Amino acid sequence: MAKGKQSGSSNSRDELMVNCSFCGRSSDEVNSMIAGPNAFICDRCIQSAVDIIKHDLSAITTKRRSNKTAKLVKPTEIRDELNKYVVGQERAKKALAVAVYNHYKRIESQEWLLEEDDVVIEKSNILLIGPTGTGKTLLAQTLANILDVPFTIVDATSLTEAGYVGDDVESILARLLQAADYNLERAEKGIIYIDEIDKIARKSANVSITRDVSGEGVQQALLKILEGTVAGVPPKGGRKHPEQHLINVNTKNILFICGGAFEGLEKVISRRLAQNAMGFGTAITAASEKESIELISKVTPEDLYQFGLIPEFIGRMPFIATLDPLNKEALKNILIEPKNAITKQYKKLFEMENVELIFDTDALDLVVDTAVKRGTGARALRSVLEEVMLNIMFDLPNMNEVKTCIITKECIEKKAEPMYLYGESERKKSA
């Protein structure tokens, strides 16, 4: 180590004088100078480096603590966040909030639970039952956003047993890996939503002698990844090939949410309730919408078995949440209330063009009425509006003088042009 303020003649001092390779200070300007291979560093630069490292480590630690806390969002907080994006479905929101909280609390607790002395907490996979367009997919997607975890959606009807044409169940994990940018640690704590799960039910409760490669066979194939296993996944998706490098994905901490409409399930439930009440089967009459909602809320694992899900699959779905059909009031609220309501999205797009977008109340009511007739729930709201807004948004970028665009009932009913406002007071209908 060379030190500053060396004694001796001027010539000897010049020979001993060295400069810091980082800041350029000479040895007589600092307290000490450390020599390395072809380089020197002074005590001031060392102190600066220590301060920088401490600051960076502190920031990393804070971020890790923040991420750790974020995973354990309380059920009430999860429900409140869901309320910002999903209208109604209070029963389903509460069930999802509890299931998700328990799932990620289970993951965090694995670091300190004793293997022999503590109770093993099983996975809390979720089954969502409800008509088309009631918010099953949106609930799952919103949960993933709240928790900041990778998320992917899979259509159960595209899955087949290994060895048959179609996607095998391990392709689900490949999609989750892609959603996580191939960050294995994040992927192994992600959420997978399997839609149309009711479409892979057996056609009857009796075991068929024929091979069901897209029904019961897929249910059997899903069992291991639902419960927790290490599966080899091709790095870029697709089918496995001999000598191919595989990424081993552990599914024990992946949350699976399965959803389906389960059309006809209310008849299965009604038959069971009738048998319990009368002691024998009675004629099943057509149930009203209100009665169907009440029946679906009383679903049991036995009903799901009678519908066509195998017992092992049902056993891996401990949380069952039912969703209600959407009435006109709910659809109207979906149009305008959620944080990402479709009308708010259109208003934002128009705002980017410096145009204010206004929807007349009568126009919104007609959108709802049209959506109800189409029978696809909230999905129909978007399709109805897109049909109306397409031509308007096509022409809007060329209409530099427009300040306000008003969507009227005639726009929905007759595909008429909207009312445009030019400047502060002049209202003019488009030619």
Curated annotation (Swiss-Prot):
<dbReference type="GO" id="GO:0140662">
    <property type="term" value="F:ATP-dependent protein folding chaperone"/>
</dbReference>
<dbReference type="InterPro" id="IPR027417">
    <property type="entry name" value="P-loop_NTPase"/>
</dbReference>
<dbReference type="GO" id="GO:0005524">
    <property type="term" value="F:ATP binding"/>
</dbReference>
<keyword id="KW-0143">Chaperone</keyword>
<dbReference type="InterPro" id="IPR019489">
    <property type="entry name" value="Clp_ATPase_C"/>
</dbReference>
<keyword id="KW-0862">Zinc</keyword>
<dbReference type="Pfam" id="PF06689">
    <property type="entry name" value="zf-C4_ClpX"/>
</dbReference>
<keyword id="KW-0547">Nucleotide-binding</keyword>
<dbReference type="GO" id="GO:0051301">
    <property type="term" value="P:cell division"/>
</dbReference>
<dbReference type="InterPro" id="IPR038366">
    <property type="entry name" value="Znf_CppX_C4_sf"/>
</dbReference>
<comment type="similarity">
    <text>Belongs to the ClpX chaperone family.</text>
</comment>
<dbReference type="GO" id="GO:0051082">
    <property type="term" value="F:unfolded protein binding"/>
</dbReference>
<feature type="binding site">
    <location>
        <position position="42"/>
    </location>
    <ligand>
        <name>Zn(2+)</name>
    </ligand>
</feature>
<dbReference type="GO" id="GO:0009376">
    <property type="term" value="C:HslUV protease complex"/>
</dbReference>
<feature type="binding site">
    <location>
        <position position="45"/>
    </location>
    <ligand>
        <name>Zn(2+)</name>
    </ligand>
</feature>
<keyword id="KW-0067">ATP-binding</keyword>
<comment type="function">
    <text>ATP-dependent specificity component of the Clp protease. It directs the protease to specific substrates. Can perform chaperone functions in the absence of ClpP.</text>
</comment>
<dbReference type="GO" id="GO:0046983">
    <property type="term" value="F:protein dimerization activity"/>
</dbReference>
<dbReference type="InterPro" id="IPR003959">
    <property type="entry name" value="ATPase_AAA_core"/>
</dbReference>
<protein>
    <recommendedName>
        <fullName>ATP-dependent Clp protease ATP-binding subunit ClpX</fullName>
    </recommendedName>
</protein>
<feature type="binding site">
    <location>
        <position position="20"/>
    </location>
    <ligand>
        <name>Zn(2+)</name>
    </ligand>
</feature>
<dbReference type="InterPro" id="IPR010603">
    <property type="entry name" value="Znf_CppX_C4"/>
</dbReference>
<dbReference type="InterPro" id="IPR046425">
    <property type="entry name" value="ClpX_bact"/>
</dbReference>
<dbReference type="InterPro" id="IPR004487">
    <property type="entry name" value="Clp_protease_ATP-bd_su_ClpX"/>
</dbReference>
<dbReference type="Pfam" id="PF07724">
    <property type="entry name" value="AAA_2"/>
</dbReference>
<dbReference type="InterPro" id="IPR050052">
    <property type="entry name" value="ATP-dep_Clp_protease_ClpX"/>
</dbReference>
<dbReference type="GO" id="GO:0008270">
    <property type="term" value="F:zinc ion binding"/>
</dbReference>
<feature type="binding site">
    <location>
        <begin position="131"/>
        <end position="138"/>
    </location>
    <ligand>
        <name>ATP</name>
    </ligand>
</feature>
<dbReference type="GO" id="GO:0051603">
    <property type="term" value="P:proteolysis involved in protein catabolic process"/>
</dbReference>
<dbReference type="InterPro" id="IPR003593">
    <property type="entry name" value="AAA+_ATPase"/>
</dbReference>
<keyword id="KW-0479">Metal-binding</keyword>
<feature type="binding site">
    <location>
        <position position="23"/>
    </location>
    <ligand>
        <name>Zn(2+)</name>
    </ligand>
</feature>
<feature type="domain" description="ClpX-type ZB">
    <location>
        <begin position="6"/>
        <end position="61"/>
    </location>
</feature>
<comment type="subunit">
    <text>Component of the ClpX-ClpP complex. Forms a hexameric ring that, in the presence of ATP, binds to fourteen ClpP subunits assembled into a disk-like structure with a central cavity, resembling the structure of eukaryotic proteasomes.</text>
</comment>
<dbReference type="GO" id="GO:0016887">
    <property type="term" value="F:ATP hydrolysis activity"/>
</dbReference>
<dbReference type="Pfam" id="PF10431">
    <property type="entry name" value="ClpB_D2-small"/>
</dbReference>
